[in-house]
């Protein structure tokens, strides 16, 4: 009992003195050329530690080339079963009829959306065997092109389509040895603490979030870098029309000198999914 109490006391002391750890995840690489450039910029000049790539997206081939230029970047497969934008679309990479709309694209939404009635995957007769076929095809293509893939994530929450899909995604992650689940490792998701409409809003709310991080705990912050270019201004869907300005704000925040300075001052340790996996193995 004495030794147990000493161990618990030592663990508690370590948790209080260890720095906060933060994964900064940039999602949706591949949806546009400018999006690819933004993620590259946020990794090279900013604080991004993990990058999520959408395999069926139109700019995936360019993403593969860009990721080869940054071999130390941690990369995850952002499994996708939807194609949400009105002016740019992507299709499954496998033969999975129940996941396609009448034009052969993924449905724009995963869950029912008043702006897209009847056009959510959940509202249509999808089949689990098609989901498995598509997930496997995306994973295998990603591993072929980017062998260092470390983990999976899920675009627009597609794994929440049903408990069956969630279990399938977990099974495949283990089968392909890319099973890192932050939730199972005690990682806390964090968001902007305050308004996030403009670049300045994002910056101040991100700094406020950083200020709230506690010693000894591990956190995950997710957003979508982009650039305010003509290309991205043409990418939108009903209910999210300001994509370019919004995602430029993410890039501005993640590359802002004040953010890096604050992280250094507070002693926050930036880590990746792969770091999380390595640290778990070493325990």
Regions of interest found by a model, annotated:
Residues 3-13:
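Sec-dependent N-terminal signal peptides
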Residues 28, 75, 152, 221, ...:
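Conserved, mostly hydrophobic/aromatic
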Residues 29, 54-56, 78-84, 157, ...:
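Active-site beta-loop-alpha junctions enriched in small/polar residues
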Residues 180-183, 239-283:
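C-terminal domain-boundary segment and adjacent tail
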Residues 122-207, 211-214:
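Catalytic domains of cell-wall/extracellular-matrix polysaccharide-remodeling enzymes
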Residues 17-84:
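Active-site beta->alpha N-cap acidic-glycine motif
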Residues 88-121, 237-242:
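Active-site gating loops and adjacent loop-to-helix segments of metal-dependent hydrolytic enzymes
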Residues 39-45, 62-74, 91-105, 143-144, ...:
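Acidic (Asp/Glu)-rich catalytic clusters
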């Amino acid at each position: 009992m004495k030794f147990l109490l000493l161990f618990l006391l030592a663990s508690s002391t370590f948790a209080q003195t260890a720095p906060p750890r933060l994964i900064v995840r940039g999602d949706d690489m591949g949806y546009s050329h400018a999006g690819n450039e933004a993620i590259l910029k946020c990794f090279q000049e900013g604080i991004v530690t993990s990058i999520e790539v959408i395999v069926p997206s139109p700019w995936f081939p360019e993403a593969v080339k860009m990721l080869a230029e940054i071999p130390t970047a941690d990369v995850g497969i952002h499994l996708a079963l939807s194609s949400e934008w009105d002016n740019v679309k992507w299709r499954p990479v496998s033969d999975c009829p129940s996941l396609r709309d009448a034009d052969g694209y993924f449905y724009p939404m995963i869950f029912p959306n008043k702006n897209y009635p009847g056009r959510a995957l959940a509202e249509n007769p999808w089949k689990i065997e098609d989901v498995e076929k598509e997930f496997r095809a995306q994973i295998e293509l990603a591993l072929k092109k980017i062998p260092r893939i470390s983990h999976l994530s899920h675009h627009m929450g597609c794994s929440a389509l049903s408990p069956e899909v969630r279990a399938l995604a977990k099974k495949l992650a283990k089968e392909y040895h890319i099973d890192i689940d932050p939730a199972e490792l005690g990682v806390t998701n964090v968001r902007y603490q305050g308004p996030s409409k403009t670049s300045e809003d994002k910056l101040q709310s991100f700094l406020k979030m950083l200020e709230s991080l506690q010693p000894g705990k591990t956190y995950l912050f997710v957003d979508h870098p982009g650039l305010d270019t003509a290309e991205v201004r043409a990418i939108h869907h009903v209910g999210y029309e300001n994509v370019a300005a919004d995602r430029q704000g993410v890039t501005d925040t993640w590359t802002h000198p004040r953010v890096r300075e604050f992280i250094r001052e507070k002693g926050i340790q930036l880590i990746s999914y792969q770091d999380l996996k390595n640290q778990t193995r070493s325990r």
